[in-house]
């Protein structure tokens, strides 16, 4: 099975960036612990000040199962609390591999 990715493109709420970055390692650790099949999380800051949150899963099935668990993971909710309403969420698998 090819690895699967969730990629979220967003801004951070005004005035929340510093707190988000300081809380992020602990929040990521909680998410990793509670969502089976999650291989990696990377936060990428783009030149325009927006962020890509890239989650790498062992499979599409693991990513789909996580959707059901996401609401039960307090750390995931806290991460989303730093974001405004408008996010772009993309999903897909590794091509050619």
Question: Language-model segments: which ranges?
Answer:
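Short, surface-exposed ligand-recognition loops at beta-strand->loop->(often short) alpha-helix junctions
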Residues: 11-22
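Active-site-flanking beta-strand signature of metal-NTP-handling nucleotidyl enzymes
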Residues: 4-11, 52
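An amphipathic, aromatic/His-enriched active-site/gating alpha helix that lines ligand/cofactor pockets
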Residues: 26, 30-39, 56-90
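Short, low-order "capping/linker" segments at domain edges
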Residues: 91-97
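Amphipathic, hydrophobic secondary-structure cores in small proteins
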Residues: 40, 51-52
